[in-house]
Amino acid sequence: MKYDNLLDRFIKYVKVNTRSDPDSETTPSTESQEAFALTILKPEMEAIGLQDVHYNPVNGYLIGTLPANNPTLTRKIGFIAHMDTADFNAENVNPQIIDNYQGEDITLGSSNYKLDPKAFPNLNNYIGQTLITTDGTTLLGADDKSGIAEIMTAIEFLTSQPQIEHCDIKVAFGPDEEIGVGADKFEVADFEVDFAYTMDGGPLGELQYETFSAAALEVTFLGRNVHPGTAKDQMINALQLAIDFHEKLPAKERPEYTDGYQGFYHLTGLTGTVEEARASYIIRDFEEASFEARKVKVENIAQSMNAQLGTKRVLVELNDQYYNMKKVIEKDMTAIELAKEVMEELTIKPVIEPIRGGTDGSKISFMGIPTPNIFAGGENMHGRFEFVSLQTMERAVDVIIGLVCKA
């Protein structure tokens, strides 16, 4: 094993339930994230040689510093990963380790689930490697505990090899990325770097500086309930209004029909009765004009329906969540060019594609710190079929070390 503690560190992290809670109003959204930061990560950061390790209870970030040991390396580089996991069972994570994978089906514990290369052809990219999977009852949490483990392992390597020269390094582990609010309270003044990287990507080589622009849409439908036996010309069914609204959106502009640079409308929740219904959507696009046009479209649909109904029964609430960080990063591509150069020197082919999602870097970039995203290794994230390759994680550690030594 290239880095002795990487696997054990990762296994230790994923066994801690740090699932975030979208309905919480606290920061972090769950107590387990703060406990993870204070009882596991903070002591370990101090033990491996990070300095000024401190936890900010206001924003939930745990930050540490490794000062440069060569004054000619003047850049300051940050590395960021998130502590929370996605909206899937994270209690009693029991990882499986598959050594020397040879393309077979992988039975997930004693569950009835398996990782089948026919269903998941990405498995064929990992022949001969060590895979870490779930037992079929939980997610794994490689998103983003692989990133945390990689950053920690890189720091440990550097402090154990003081002859290796590196620049100033800042490390930040934050909360609630999966529910879209993790970076809302991020303190730039507490993270003085020239640029940073989130270690939150997927397969080997991913290097990303384009994200969706994102908005949350809540639509409330106000009906009028009367006895169905005498409902003619009187009843207004709020659930039917919700159906009508949804059908006015472009049918092919949904996640299941889009890829690449295509945006979408995604219905994530629908609840209600005849009297009142509520639909929750997320809106995503890459280009600013297209993003704004999508928001205008839903407003226009609501206005048209209200005009037809003769009163305001379709109420729209739109909230922007984050924006495409390309707008910031393309002004100075130093972080991207450096990462490309380091990867190529390590014989890793950079895979530069848009993220069909967002990272904490989306918001942090607009706060003044360009923060692209680098691969951390996770595959099939956010569910029971999640897995990660140990060899990909090792290569991510290589990249982190390469970046700070080349700065």
Curated annotation (Swiss-Prot):
Q: Name one GO cellular component term.
A: cytosol
Q: Which Pfam family, giving just one, matches this sequence? A: Peptidase_M20
The EC number(s) given in the record are: 3.4.11.4
Q: Which InterPro entries match?
A: ArgE/DapE_CS, Bact_exopeptidase_dim_dom, Peptidase_M20, Peptidase_M20_dimer, Peptidase_M20B
The GO biological-process annotations, alphabetized, read as:
peptide catabolic process; proteolysis
Listed HAMAP family: Aminopeptidase_M20 (MF_00550)
The similarity comment for this entry is:
Belongs to the peptidase M20B family.
- The molecule here is called Peptidase T
Lineage start: Bacteria, Bacillati, Bacillota, Bacilli, Lactobacillales
